[in-house]
């Protein structure tokens, strides 16, 4: 197979686009801010296809299973993994921010902060509750779930649909085959959309640098640096340890999903890579049914980067405003976040809304303190989204192995770069899910 020129690689194209976006934002900020529609448009194109892809993947995965017991086992193991790892992430964030104390010495009076820009986040945060979150999983209408692009609602309906289709046996086979064909079409659409990924990454990065400026980061740089280093160490040590214990290298895995990571870096949303992650994890040897359950569910229940951010940001606000936080307050914060963090979907800005909800729920911390980190939240969202993406990928491999639904030979070949670059479904008609 002839190797394509390096400049045709999506990885290289997105990397160059991000670099150009940063340069434009730094030297021509007004022009860069006008590039925002390119980034927004790309994210909207991706989100357009997410709901049908989740539906097709989950339905064909569940309906094609030999036994429904496998679905329950997969879901249970996934939730167990999510709860343990996200709790570890919350604790790590809490420990690091207490040791480094990036907010100490700022002596900010919450009453002097401009809260006008955080009013919408605070209002959205106050509406967050565990009961509302659980009730929101059930869609008011099926059409509404797809129209709004609510991942958990689409997943809920997809599981029910797949279960019902499985019960029909051979009578439901025509429906199963039709949905499988629709799945191939949807992944083809994603392949087409991904051709404009460099433009989307350029627009999003240019806007970010142009709107906020690199210079504005200096004052709060200690928190950002602390957060970025913590995320890197979490990926390499915690996720790396989990990966090593399950027979694969975290560095090779990161290299395997490098294109998806760059797309996320450009858009600041791990959701923008969701369709390709589903495809990539299947190619890696994970069973389709496991991928269909773990990846979408992980976008609400396994956001490791967001978990680290939430504890660090909350305690940073306390330190900066000289709000005392003893061990009881910090344990309360941790318990609140164990619940609240599950509502942080993988979209830009959701982590900030959950942080607002947490400050409101704890009551001890000034919600006005959100204004302190509003300016740098956009820059920290890259590290959150990247960590979330790697975390969900590792979770998929681990749960697949636990459920004995992992082809370990394929896993090692793909991570070593020896796998077939085309889709695992070699019988897909022309235009199938080939690698971009």
UniProtKB/Swiss-Prot annotation:
Cited PANTHER family: AEROBIC C4-DICARBOXYLATE TRANSPORT PROTEIN, PROTON/GLUTAMATE-ASPARTATE SYMPORTER
An annotated GO BP: dicarboxylic acid transport
InterPro entries (alphabetical): C4_dicarb_transport (IPR023954), Na-dicarboxylate_symporter (IPR001991), Na-dicarboxylate_symporter_CS (IPR018107), Na:dicarbo_symporter_sf (IPR036458)
Topological relation to the membrane, as annotated: Multi-pass membrane protein
Family membership: Belongs to the dicarboxylate/amino acid:cation symporter (DAACS) (TC 2.A.23) family.
Keyword presence, Lipid metabolism: no
Annotated spans, Disordered: 414-436
Miscellaneous comment as given in the Swiss-Prot or TrEMBL entry: The DctPQM carrier is more efficient than the DctA carrier for the utilization of succinate at micromolar concentrations, whereas DctA is the major transporter at millimolar concentrations.
Free-text function comment from the UniProt entry: Responsible for the transport of dicarboxylates such as succinate, fumarate, and malate from the periplasm across the inner membrane.
GO CC entries: plasma membrane
Membrane-spanning segments: 14-34, 45-65, 77-97, 142-162, 198-218, 223-243, 290-310, 331-351, 353-373
Domain of life: Bacteria
NCBIfam families: PRK01663.1 (NF002461), PRK13027.1 (NF009587)
Loss of function: phenotype: Inactivation of the gene causes a growth defect in minimal media supplemented with succinate, fumarate or malate. The dctA-dctPQM double mutant shows no growth on malate and fumarate and residual growth on succinate.
Primary residence: membrane
A Pfam cross-reference name: SDF
Gene this chain is encoded by: dctA2
Expression induction: Expression is maximal in early exponential growth phase and declines with cell density to reach a plateau in the stationary growth phase. Induced by the C(4)-dicarboxylates succinate, fumarate and malate. Positively regulated by RpoN and the DctB/DctD two-component system. Negatively autoregulated.
GO molecular function term, any single one: fumarate transmembrane transporter activity
Keywords: Cell inner membrane, Cell membrane, Membrane, Symport, Transmembrane, Transmembrane helix, Transport
Protein name: C4-dicarboxylate transport protein 2
Subcellular location: Cell inner membrane
SUPFAM superfamilies per record: Proton glutamate symport protein
